[in-house]
Design a protein with these regions (language model features):
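Short, basic, low-complexity termini and linkers enriched in Ser/Thr/Gly/Pro
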Residues: 1-11, 15, 20-32, 37
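N-terminal Rossmann-like NAD(P)+-binding subdomain of aldehyde/semialdehyde dehydrogenases
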Residues: 37-159
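Short, well-ordered beta-strand elements within core beta-sheets of diverse protein domains
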Residues: 74-78, 272-277, 303, 335
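Conserved small-residue-rich beta-alpha loop and adjacent elements
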Residues: 143-207
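Conserved NAD(P)+-binding/catalytic subdomain of aldehyde/semialdehyde dehydrogenases
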Residues: 213-300
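NAD(P)-dependent aldehyde/semialdehyde dehydrogenase
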Residues: 298-335
């Protein structure tokens, strides 16, 4: 690499952030000396090369969808036919244990085990979400016109809603708040949260369920959880609507459930596109890309830049940060 070509980049930012510039220069120097393969697949857009990348990304997602939907369709049909026996069978196979209700005391203990600063942040977020959605609330109204005419609308919350909350190595307490609190504001009668059982269930997620006012938490995940909520099985009742994100299997199950129950949306793998010129901070850009890449092996994290030096700097910074994250194996697959 011709280091002289990046000298203007270093010089014009020197007064603003010498530390970042020195760090960037060390990355460029390391790359020049070691000539290591870039963490990111860097493609020069020429009208053809980028189209090949886009086709590859689409094909990867489409191929996975086809295989997954076939598996999910079989599980959904089996649960519909055999009910609770099928749910338990799949839960023991994929979750490692039969479904169970998480007792209120477990939620209380999880709440008390969390850092008080985290609890304060969750409660503040809950209050903000509640206040915002109260302003959006569609209300019942009636208009009495002349000659006995009465027009209007009646708005009622659904009787029962199921909330899917992802498990695994990542904790998503925000997902609990953003799904449960608007439902409470809307007047939903009963909230049932399902989340995969783990050896140590996330205290943050369980605390968020307590703060949001979730009525019942059930330890079950994956397609079998969506199937149980869709058709009702054992102590898991049928719901009117299923909301919340999940992996590709959960998304496919929600797609098949739609029509029997309502759903919020079919959420595909996470995608992010970051546009950054030479002035962008590689540390921040890398963090933005990784925040989506770590969600799923089929996630897509794409960077657009007009600076090859910047592309290489961000690639190196992504690799440095990624190796510090617990979902390193997933990130390697997604990028």
């Amino acid at each position: 690499m011709n280091v002289r070509r990046i000298a203007p980049l270093l010089n014009h930012r020197a007064k603003r952030d010498t530390t970042i510039l020195n760090y960037q220069f060390s990355i460029f120097h390391s790359y020049r000396e070691e000539r290591q393969q870039m963490f990111l697949n860097i493609v020069k857009a020429d009208g053809t090369a980028e189209q090949a990348v886009i086709r590859e990304m689409k094909a990867r997602a489409a191929g996975a969808r086809g295989d997954i939907e076939q598996i999910v369709r079989g599980v959904m049909a089996d649960v519909q036919q055999r009910g609770w026996d099928a749910v338990v069978e799949y839960a023991e196979r994929f979750d490692g244990k039969a479904p169970y209700i998480v007792e209120p005391k477990v939620l209380d203990d999880a709440y008390n085990a969390c850092d008080p600063k985290l609890i304060a942040a969750l409660e503040k977020a809950a209050a903000n979400i509640r206040d915002y959605h109260e302003q959006m609330l569609v209300k019942t109204w009636e208009w009495n016109r002349a000659k006995g005419e009465t027009l209007g609308q009646t708005v009622r919350g659904l009787s029962r809603v199921g909330i899917y909350v992802p498990g695994g190595t990542a904790a998503y307490p925000s997902s609990v708040l953003m799904n449960a609190i608007p439902a409470k504001v809307a007047g939903v009668g009963e909230l049932i949260m399902v989340t995969p059982p783990t050896e140590n269930m996330s205290n943050e997620v369980l605390a968020a369920a307590k703060i949001a006012g979730v009525d019942t938490v059930i330890a079950i995940g994956g397609t079998q959880a969506i199937a149980a909520l869709t058709y009702g099985a054992g102590f898991i009742p049928q719901v009117d609507k299923i909301v919340g994100p999940g992996n590709a299997f959960v998304a496919a199950a929600k797609k098949l459930a739609f029509g029997t129950v309502d759903i919020d949306m079919i959420a595909g793998p996470s995608e992010v596109l970051v546009i950054a010129d030479h002035t962008a901070n590689p540390t921040y850009v890398a963090a933005d890309l990784l925040s989506q890449a770590e969600h799923d092996k089929l996630a897509s994290a794409v960077l657009l830049t007009d600076s090859m030096a910047q592309a290489q700097a961000i690639s190196c910074e992504m690799e440095r940060q990624a190796k510090l994250l617990p979902r390193w194996d997933i990130i390697k697959e997604s990028v």
